[in-house]
């Protein structure tokens, strides 16, 4: 079993940005003490939903502040920055940390990012796939060049070279069938969403495995991650109530940060996300409290045993043994750390990998 910690850098109304940054640093350091293998940093711009515009810089700080902890991005919005600059950052972190950096990528969901950085959101999928191909080739070859409809530049040597054999490990934040199939073609591990239930996670893995096997990948050695909103307390009601205010603001901030869910939005390539939002509305989840209540049904929020039951159900359904949690809904920094430590002592030791013979 492996365990990760998502550091959201969301700014609740009662916190200053300086307080959010202090929380990020402290939780990153404490994560290593609490037995987490990896912390994951999210890229967001122009919204209190996440204050981390450059996860590479934050990753460098946390890698320098820890000894064994892996630090990953979940995820870099791949199409909005030049692929050569990105590989330079990735390789530098890979070298300086001696292989402790994890390169999580996505194609992006927030309209303003694309407008400000001068990228056409309608082409986000094609750009992300193109950028990944260039970056991955650069990781292994040490050089990059491009001559296609999206980008053109002459062959250049990328410094420094990667430290890890084959480059820093790459992960994909995957929600739609299209992204799942694309990740499977390359055998890239997915970070699965915390907003889908066990049956949906199982179906996503089945689709991935079918495609990955067609491309010759060993599906038993791909390090997928299950992601969760997490709050652990011996009092189940307290665990849920302490999260409610934070999650209410956080969910609303998420919806308000993009226009992709508006019926009037005509951006191409986001039919899955729009359809998922329509399903939420039909289920009554547009109401914030109802959405939170549903989140509690599929995320480890409650007593240690309740958390074990929810996570173990997903492990048994998917075979995934890399569990990534986000604890920041737990209130103050001290309350967040208390929840992390209780998770370490009363949840981590009792989660079991699915037996290989029963995996698929």
UniProtKB/Swiss-Prot annotation:
Pfam families: Bac_luciferase (PF00296). PANTHER family: BLR5498 PROTEIN, LUCIFERASE-LIKE MONOOXYGENASE. The synthesis of this protein is regulated by a complex control mechanism that has been termed autoinduction. Its EC number is 1.14.14.3. GO terms for cellular component: cytosol. It comes from the Bacteria. Signal peptide: none annotated. Heterodimer of an alpha and a beta chain. Belongs to the bacterial luciferase oxidoreductase family. It is an enzyme of class 1 (oxidoreductase). Light-emitting reaction in luminous bacteria. Keywords: Flavoprotein, FMN, Luminescence, Monooxygenase, Oxidoreductase, Photoprotein. GO terms for biological process: bioluminescence. It catalyses: a long-chain fatty aldehyde + FMNH2 + O2 = a long-chain fatty acid + hnu + FMN + H2O + 2 H(+). This is Alkanal monooxygenase alpha chain. The keyword Flavoprotein applies. InterPro entries: Alkanal_monooxygenase, Bact_Lucif_Oxidored, Bacterial_luciferase_CS, Luciferase-like_dom, Luciferase-like_sf, Luciferase_bac/NFP. One of its GO terms (molecular function) is alkanal monooxygenase (FMN-linked) activity. SUPFAM superfamilies: Bacterial luciferase-like.
């Amino acid at each position: 079993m492996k365990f990760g910690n998502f550091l959201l850098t969301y700014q609740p109304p009662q916190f200053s940005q300086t307080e959010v940054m202090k929380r990020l640093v402290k939780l990153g350091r404490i994560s290593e003490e609490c037995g987490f293998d990896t912390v994951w940093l999210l890229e967001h711009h122009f919204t209190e939903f996440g204050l981390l515009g450059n996860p590479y810089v934050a990753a460098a700080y946390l890698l320098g502040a820890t000894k064994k902890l892996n630090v990953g991005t979940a995820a870099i919005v791949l199409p909005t920055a030049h692929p050569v600059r990105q590989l330079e950052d990735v390789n530098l972190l890979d070298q300086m940390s001696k292989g402790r950096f994890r390169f999580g990528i996505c194609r992006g969901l927030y309209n303003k990012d694309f407008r400000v950085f001068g990228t056409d959101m309608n082409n986000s999928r094609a750009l992300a796939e193109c950028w990944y191909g260039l970056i991955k080739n650069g990781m292994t070859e040490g050089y990059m060049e491009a001559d296609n409809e999206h980008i053109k530049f002459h062959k250049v040597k990328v410094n420094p070279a990667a430290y890890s054999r084959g480059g820093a490990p790459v992960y994909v934040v995957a929600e739609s069938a299209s992204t799942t199939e694309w990740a499977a073609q390359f055998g890239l591990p997915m970070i699965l969403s915390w907003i889908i239930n066990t049956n949906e996670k199982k179906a996503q893995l089945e689709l991935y495995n079918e495609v990955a096997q067609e491309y010759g990948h060993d599906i038993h050695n791909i390090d997928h991650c299950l992601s969760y909103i997490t709050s652990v307390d011996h009092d189940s009601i307290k665990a849920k109530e302490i999260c409610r205010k934070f999650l209410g603001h956080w969910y609303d901030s998420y919806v308000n940060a993009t226009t992709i869910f508006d019926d009037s939005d005509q951006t191409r390539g986001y039919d899955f996300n729009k359809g998922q939002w329509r399903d939420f509305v039909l289920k009554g989840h547009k109401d914030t409290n109802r959405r939170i209540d549903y989140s509690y049904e599929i995320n480890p929020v409650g007593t240690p045993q309740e958390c074990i039951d929810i996570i173990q159900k997903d492990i048994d359904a998917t075979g995934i043994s890399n569990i990534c949690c986000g604890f920041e809904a737990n209130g103050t920094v001290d309350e967040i750390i208390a929840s992390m430590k209780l998770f370490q002592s009363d949840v981590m030791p009792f989660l079991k990998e699915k037996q290989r013979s029963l995996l698929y």
